[in-house]
Each structure stands twice: as structure tokens, then as C-alpha cells.
């Protein structure tokens, strides 16, 4: 799934 750094929007954790 897609994840992102702190502050970003989580797509699919």
C-alpha cells in the first residue's frame, strides 16, 4: 500500500 512521510496524507496504510 502507499504511505507517506509525516505531514502528508496517507493513501492506504
Swiss-Prot record:
Cellular component, GO annotation: extracellular region
Post-translational modification: N-glycosylated.
GO molecular function: carbohydrate binding; metal ion binding; toxin activity
Keyword Glycoprotein: yes
Tissue expr: Expressed by the venom gland.
Subcellular location(s) of the protein: Secreted
Kinase keyword on record: no
Keywords recorded for this protein, A-Z: Blood coagulation cascade activating toxin, Calcium, Disulfide bond, Glycoprotein, Hemostasis impairing toxin, Lectin, Metal-binding, Secreted, Toxin
Residue ranges constituting the C-type lectin domain according to the UniProt record: 11-13
Other noteworthy facts: Calcium is required for ligand binding. The molecular weight was determined to be 75 kDa with an isoelectric point of 4.6. Upon reduction, this activator migrated as two bands of 16 kDa and 14 kDa.
Described purpose of this protein according to its UniProt entry: Regulatory subunit of coagulation factor X-activating enzyme, a zinc-protease enzyme that impairs hemostasis in envenomed animal. Activates coagulation factor X (F10) in a calcium-dependent manner probably by cleaving the Arg-Ile bond at position 234.
Family the entry assigns: Belongs to the snaclec family.
Assembly mode: Heterotrimer; disulfide-linked. The heterotrimer consists of 1 heavy chain (a metalloproteinase) and 2 light chains: LC1 and LC2.
Protein name: Snaclec coagulation factor X-activating enzyme light chain 2
Biological source species: Vipera aspis aspis
Amino acid at each position: 500500500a502507499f504511505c507517506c512521510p509525516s505531514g502528508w496524507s496517507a493513501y492506504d496504510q
